[in-house]
């Protein structure tokens, strides 16, 4: 029996359309397998440590090592704005009976940026597993908050019942309100790392530029677009964009040599940095440059605007030690004037948006507040003086390929 001519034509049309769709999907690495999205649910593996976790070969001479580090970056659009949700799953295996090294392996510190509630840690849980099958649960309730500096706090905790042969596992989610940059994802540490996996689930309205830093090991990269739509592939129907997933992975990452750095391990630690590069619907490219960083400072936290709001300090500087003129002796005298009256609270800082009246009254003040007072006195006395923003030795070198306000952690002054 012959098919009607219209049906044959329709079949040929459909067949040709399917071939075109297959070629398009292949060229764009589009997958229709939703199982790929299951890889992002790293918390589903929490609490399920297999026997091979205890049987695998360790690293000779190393007291402990990271068996697994997995990170998933995703985004949530909320009424108050877009939030980054970053899931972390970490497994550590202890291979020593040295109590000091065991304490080192079991002590965990999670840094987070606390001003303006920019970051917070949720979903913190953990287990300590023993080769015999026993496990001890850590609820996260015993974690302590420790002040690191004016911008960062550390959520610190000790995993329980850790001994030689134990496997430590913990998970948490970092909720971040500032999406222009994301926290660095660290690949290398003071001990070896067996396996690292990083996934980023992108949203249609934003993309990130990735900057590699100290990646001297093999780092695999792949990307896939997953079609999750149930809408038929007909050109007259509007279909949502496929889910764009990026993945980075590495295995057997060597430890960072302690002798390889002088001030900060971050100078030599292998990591990825993320900075927003496109935003909107449709997406538009965004400017990332040091000129833009300078414009941000002038627009949002202009130190000279604060000086204008504290004109009495300039008047004070004009009157102090005026007989010394514009000499180095006067600069030194103004420095000693501030130094003898200010009370440093041991907090290094870059910018300040609070008042300055308390500094010369001997109330506790941070580095930026004290230096802003000295800057006002110097400029009031007629000196050419400017703030100098730096990264302190303990904070690590500035990466010139990654323009960011958050690479600075201290403020100094230049005067002449």
Q: Predicted segments — roles?
A:
Residues 1-31:
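Bacterial Sec-dependent N-terminal signal peptides
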Residues 12, 86, 120-122, 194, ...:
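Alpha-helical structural motif
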Residues 24-299, 369-379, 385-416:
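Beta-strand-rich, non-transmembrane domain signature
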Residues 80-81, 116, 283, 307-310, ...:
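Generic detection of long, well-ordered alpha-helical segments
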Residues 95, 173, 318-322, 339-343, ...:
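Sec-exported extracytoplasmic/periplasmic mature domains
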Residues 108-115, 185-187, 320, 353-365:
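Conserved short loop/turn motifs at secondary-structure junctions
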Residues 160, 326, 330, 359-370, ...:
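Secondary-structure capping and boundary motifs in well-ordered enzyme cores
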Residues 291-362:
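Secondary-structure boundary elements
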